[in-house]
């Protein structure tokens, strides 16, 4: 059993070391990162990858909806100012070193065999693999809902943590760059359900890391103020209501938890479409 666990640990470390080399060797001179301990290499890889993802996704998103599709998705008068977007970038950059510490810590725990994470499908079939992904996402959705709600309901937490994000409370101050503009501890608290779920549900290493980093794209999308009206997705239309009312639509991926716990508010456009269907 000890040998099996040691083999598992070695396999995971070899895999994460490969990811470190794959990212860092293309971005930095070898002499700057290779002497670092494995944990610091992992954090540096996550930090650089997180920044690249944030800027590329944010820039492309803004360029498309504010310039290429001007007045198509967002009215000209509702486009956030350059000053507002630069402030959001500044807040996100202050927090980024701390955000990217979380996946480094989760990888450390995975490498030491403390979680239910796995790196091969040797002991699972594809059906179980997808079932566990679904359970993982349900757990994450449930936990993020309650973390987010308590960040509003507990006044101390709101004042000292979550209020930083709610500086952006109007359509003309929200942009994709606001997606990661949090107090560092606030951002970590809302991402930590991904780590807690590792101890409850078996999940593939790549799936866990991919979902963590896809959060960057997801949070950009729900701050663009464009209501996609794709049921039951908690899109930007719902999240814009959250930023303006402060007491609705705490959910993350879907409207499920808000519907279950009575905090759902449907965007006006969707209400109108419902009325038309009833007629």
From Swiss-Prot:
The chain crosses the membrane at residues 48-68, 127-147, 194-214. One of its GO terms (molecular function) is delta7-sterol 5(6)-desaturase activity. It comes from the Eukaryota. Residues 134-263 form the Fatty acid hydroxylase domain. It is a multi-pass membrane protein. A motif (Histidine box-3) lies at residues 239-243. Keywords: Endoplasmic reticulum, Iron, Lipid biosynthesis, Lipid metabolism, Membrane, Oxidoreductase, Steroid biosynthesis, Steroid metabolism, Sterol biosynthesis, Sterol metabolism, Transmembrane, Transmembrane helix. A motif (Histidine box-2) lies at residues 162-166. GO terms for cellular component: endoplasmic reticulum membrane. Its cofactor is Fe cation. The keyword Transmembrane applies. It catalyses: a Delta(7)-sterol + 2 Fe(II)-[cytochrome b5] + O2 + 2 H(+) = a Delta(5),Delta(7)-sterol + 2 Fe(III)-[cytochrome b5] + 2 H2O. Its EC number is 1.14.19.20. A motif (Histidine box-1) lies at residues 148-152. GO terms for biological process: sterol biosynthetic process. It holds the Pfam family FA_hydroxylase. It is found in: Endoplasmic reticulum membrane. Belongs to the sterol desaturase family. The histidine box domains may contain the active site and/or be involved in metal ion binding. This is Putative Delta(7)-sterol-C5(6)-desaturase 2. It comes from Arabidopsis thaliana (Mouse-ear cress). The gene is HDF7.
């Amino acid at each position: 059993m000890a040998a099996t666990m040691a083999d598992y640990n070695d396999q995971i470390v070899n895999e994460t070391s490969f990811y470190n080399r794959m990212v860092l060797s293309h971005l930095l001179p070898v002499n700057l990162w290779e002497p670092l301990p494995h944990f610091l290499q992992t954090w540096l890889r996550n930090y650089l990858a997180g920044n690249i993802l944030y800027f590329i996704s944010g820039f492309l998103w803004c360029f498309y909806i504010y310039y290429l599709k001007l007045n198509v998705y967002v009215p000209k008068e509702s486009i956030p100012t350059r000053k507002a977007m630069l402030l959001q970038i500044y807040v996100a950059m202050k927090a980024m070193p701390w955000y990217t510490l979380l996946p480094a810590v989760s990888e450390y725990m995975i490498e030491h065999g403390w979680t239910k994470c796995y790196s091969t499908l040797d002991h699972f079939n594809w059906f179980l693999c997808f079932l566990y992904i679904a359970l993982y996402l349900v757990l994450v959705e449930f936990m993020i809902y309650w973390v987010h709600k308590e960040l509003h309901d507990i006044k101390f937490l709101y004042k000292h943590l979550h209020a930083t994000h709610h500086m952006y409370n109007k359509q003309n101050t929200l942009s994709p760059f606001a997606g990661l503009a949090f107090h560092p501890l606030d951002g970590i608290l809302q991402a930590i359900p991904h780590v807690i779920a590792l101890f409850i549900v078996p999940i593939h290493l790549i799936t866990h890391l991919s979902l963590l980093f896809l959060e960057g794209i997801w949070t950009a999308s729900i701050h663009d103020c464009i209501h996609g009206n794709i049921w039951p997705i908690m899109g930007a239309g719902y999240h814009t209501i959250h930023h303006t009312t402060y007491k609705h639509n705490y959910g993350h991926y879907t409207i499920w938890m808000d519907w279950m716990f009575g905090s759902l508010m449907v965007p006006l456009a969707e209400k109108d479409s419902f009325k038309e269907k009833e007629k």
